Curated annotation (Swiss-Prot):
Keyword Membrane: no
Any one GO molecular function term: large ribosomal subunit rRNA binding
Keyword Ribonucleoprotein: yes
Protein name (record): Large ribosomal subunit protein uL14
Gene from which this protein is expressed: rplN
GO cellular component, one term: cytosolic large ribosomal subunit
Record-stated family: Belongs to the universal ribosomal protein uL14 family.
Top-level taxonomic group: Bacteria
Biological process according to GO: translation
UniProt keyword terms in alphabetical order: Ribonucleoprotein, Ribosomal protein, RNA-binding, rRNA-binding
Functional note: Binds to 23S rRNA. Forms part of two intersubunit bridges in the 70S ribosome.
Assembly: Part of the 50S ribosomal subunit. Forms a cluster with proteins L3 and L19. In the 70S ribosome, L14 and L19 interact and together make contacts with the 16S rRNA in bridges B5 and B8.
Amino acid sequence: MIQPQTYLNVADNSGARKLMCIRVLGGGNRRYGFIGDKIIAVVKDATPNMAVKKSDVVEAVIVRTRKAVSRDSGMSIRFDDNAAVIINKDGNPRGTRVFGPVARELRDKNFTKIVSLAPEVL
């Protein structure tokens, strides 16, 4: 459950380390974002000499949340942290690697490139 002002870890090698959500996309006055939702975020912490700099405004997709997500089978899944992957306008990740597990719901929302880069899909 990601809302504006929420801090997220970055699960790729684009150069950013921490993001702060400033907007949840989809719908006029949407309050919360869940796994697979796009957000607008600002980079709060970044690695030096990389593509993404501190205070850059970026678009990202949520890949892990602490809030449990229930599935149609009745199973629910939750992660240890809130994490996102920075994407470009086409929806492709800006980094070349994805760290940590990602949820299967990303495949349903057509983020297949992120799913293929991830080491584990839960």
